[in-house]
A protein has these predicted regions:
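Short beta-strand-to-loop capping motifs
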Residues: 20, 117-121, 165
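Active-site C-terminal subdomain of aminotransferase-like
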Residues: 9-13, 19-82, 88
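Short amphipathic alpha-helical segments
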Residues: 47-49, 111-115, 159-161
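Conserved PLP-binding catalytic core of the aspartate aminotransferase-like
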Residues: 84, 88, 99-147, 152-153
């Protein structure tokens, strides 16, 4: 199993891991600089050093460890409950704006804090830019590396705007996001 540290584990970008069975014979893709056997002519063959090319990202791994500690201390259920609550708040507010639809449905769906919206007649890039420029709200606009999904949804020409919520967001921030979305959509029509 491979995982990235910056999605849901609150670690920095560039962190992650690989969980394998102890006896799996796996060869590294890239070899290089070993801090444990500096004068050996060959790269270490024992795990995990065999898969570590170059300097270990110690600062990043410390950040990942802090993120995992936060999850353990806060609790997965508490984090999930808050994210679900504020995500539902946003979905309900967004759907009250004429021409805005939540892609993938909403209401009662157990999912992450990621909400993609389609705004009838509004290019997603223009909306994303307006939210950033006028409101300081960072979203992701476009095709999200999924052009076939957008073709199936009928949004391949304008894309979608994706909002991402975490347990660190507040209900006040979500309310501001709804106001910003409504005003930005109205300004772009």
């Amino acid at each position: 199993v491979c995982f990235t540290g910056h999605k849901s584990l609150f670690g920095p970008q560039g962190t992650g891991g690989l969980c394998i069975v102890p006896d799996l014979d796996i060869a590294p893709l890239v070899e290089g600089g070993s801090g444990t056997h500096t004068f050996d002519e060959r790269h270490p063959r024992f795990m995990p050093e065999a898969l570590e090319a170059g300097t270990v990202n110690a600062h990043g791994l410390a950040g990942l460890a802090a993120g995992v500690r936060f999850i353990e201390e806060t609790g997965v259920d508490a984090i999930h409950e808050k994210v679900s609550r504020i995500t539902s708040q946003f979905e309900e507010g967004a759907c009250d704006i004429g021409g805005v639809s939540v892609l993938g449905g909403h209401g009662g769906i157990d999912r992450s804090g990621v909400v993609a919206i389609d705004v009838e007649g509004v290019d997603s890039s223009l909306l994303g830019d307006a939210l950033a420029r006028d409101w300081g709200i960072c979203t992701r606009a476009g095709a999200h590396c999924a052009p076939l999904m957008h073709r199936a949804l009928g949004t391949e020409q304008r894309g979608a705007v994706r909002f991402s919520f975490s347990c660190f967001n507040t209900e006040e921030e979500v309310a501001k996001g709804i106001v910003a979305l409504k005003e930005s959509v109205n300004a772009l029509r």
